[in-house]
Design a protein with these regions (language model features):
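Short beta-strand/loop segment that forms part of the nucleotide-sugar
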Residues: 10, 22-23, 31-40
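Conserved donor nucleotide-binding strand/loop of the catalytic core
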Residues: 32-35, 46-74
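Short, well-formed alpha-helical segments that are part of the catalytic scaffolds
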Residues: 14-28
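Cell-envelope/extracellular polymer assembly enzymes that use nucleotide-activated donors
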Residues: 5-7, 177
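Catalytic donor-sugar/metal-binding loop of nucleotide-sugar-dependent glycosyltransferases
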Residues: 146, 168-170, 180-197
Length: 232
């Protein structure tokens, strides 16, 4: 039985200090390709990522979901499993096997890395981020009867499953849209604990400022309401 082709998509915005280490930590025995989406960086993120062996895709219009969608448009036709993570060094790519193996073994189609269930470095997540994960999980349980403890960016999903979800969100609500549409479609989903670190340099686009936190929270709430009332 041949090993499925895995595409790793990394979203990055001004992450020149961290991106090389993130790329180097991706298990090369699992990843068929590594795509870094440069979402409008003004530093050397693209050059550093390319030098580290990743294929760089430019998406100049800001948007977390938009960046990942740009990455999806550029992945290999061979891709069967897609892994998503951030380029700031907070996720642990070396734990990718925890996400990919259950899919390869046919036990599930969608795996979410739960930061709240893993080991979190002090200061890596603010209280409101942890609370938001559990609150959204509570709402998802009420709406769809699914168990969820986090909306973490580090996740893996079968490509054909992802394409059927028809994601549209272009902002920080993108991970939540994926989870909500997967729940509504009764996609086989599981969580696995993953470790989480403080970012390696740069500044957080969400937790780094009050404005960023408020904007992200607002976008997530809008996404929650929009998907909850949609029929398709």
């Amino acid at each position: 039985m041949s090993k499925p082709f895995v595409s790793v998509i990394i979203a990055a915005l001004n992450e020149e200090e961290a991106i090389a280490n993130v790329i180097n930590a991706v298990p090369k025995n699992l990843a068929g390709e590594i795509v870094v989406v440069d979402n409008g960086s003004t530093d050397r993120t693209a050059e550093v990522a390319s030098a580290a062996g990743a294929r760089v895709v430019k998406e100049t219009i800001p948007g977390y979901g938009r960046a990942f969608r740009a990455g999806l448009r550029s992945i290999s036709p061979q891709c069967e499993i897609v892994v998503f993570l951030d380029g700031d060094g907070s996720d642990c790519p070396e734990m990718m096997d925890r996400l990919v193996t259950p899919i390869i073994e046919g036990r599930t189609d969608f795996v979410i890395g739960s930061r709240t269930q893993g080991n979190r470095e002090r200061g890596s997540m603010n209280f409101h981020q942890v609370l938001a994960g559990y609150t959204i999980g509570f709402i998802l349980r009420i709406l769809y009867g699914v168990h969820s403890t986090d909306m973490g960016p580090f996740r893996a999903i079968r490509r054909d499953t992802l394409e059927k979800l028809k994601l549209r969100e272009e902002t920080y609500g993108w991970p939540l849209e994926m989870q909500m549409r997967a729940a509504r479609a009764h996609v086989r989903t599981m969580e696995v604990p993953v470790d989480y670190r403080r970012r390696a340099g740069g500044h957080s686009k969400i937790a780094g400022t009050l404005r960023g936190s408020v904007l992200a929270a607002t976008r997530i709430l809008i996404t929650l309401a929009r998907i909850a009332v949609q029929r398709n």
